[in-house]
A protein has these predicted regions:
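Nucleotidyltransferase catalytic core that binds NTPs
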Residues: 1-164
Length: 164
């Protein structure tokens, strides 16, 4: 069985890693869709798709990496066509993992089976919160996997975020 998990991963954090592990506990293969892949260097989408891909790959244990495939999902500004757009990019999947209510509605309209991902401390483990902590020079390192932290340090995320 194959599953789909879509997120912007701005940045990839421990909540996302938990969602990946949860997804892989339910399916053999997990397709990870990097949403808004065509957007970067913006306040809401500061990291490029390649940087986000590197954060994901460097954060996932080598023992499970072969069960994951990553796809770029650029935005289409048409909600009615979005699921069809996703389906044109990723291979067939049996389950969709999401906690986003709007994403759930869109996929369920297309007869997809949606599984909610158990969340812990959603406000703490949110990209918006983590980006703000980086800008404010507060501790954010404990909220992201070590692999993602290395990528963020390498690309000087702090400087980029402060300049946006």
């Amino acid at each position: 069985m194959d599953g789909l998990l879509i997120g912007r991963f701005q940045p990839f954090h421990l909540g996302h890693l938990g969602a990946v592990i949860f997804g892989l506990s339910k399916v053999e293969n997990l397709w990870i869709g990097i949403g808004s892949s065509n957007k970067y260097n913006e306040r809401r989408n500061p990291f490029s798709v390649d940087e986000r891909r590197e954060m994901i790959i460097s954060s996932i244990e080598p023992s499970i990496i072969d069960s994951i495939k990553i796809f770029n999902i650029p935005d289409v500004d048409n909600h009615k066509k979005w699921v069809l757009h996703v389906d044109s990019i990723v291979p067939k999947y049996d389950l969709v993992f999401t906690n986003d209510e709007f994403t759930q509605i869109l996929f369920e309209k297309h007869k997809s089976k949606v599984i909610p991902v158990p969340l812990k401390e959603r406000e703490k483990f949110s990209g918006t919160n983590i980006r703000q902590l980086i800008v404010d020079d507060k501790n954010w390192q404990d909220l992201v996997p070590k692999g993602a932290q290395k990528v963020l340090d390498k690309i000087n995320a702090e400087k980029r975020l402060k300049n946006l």
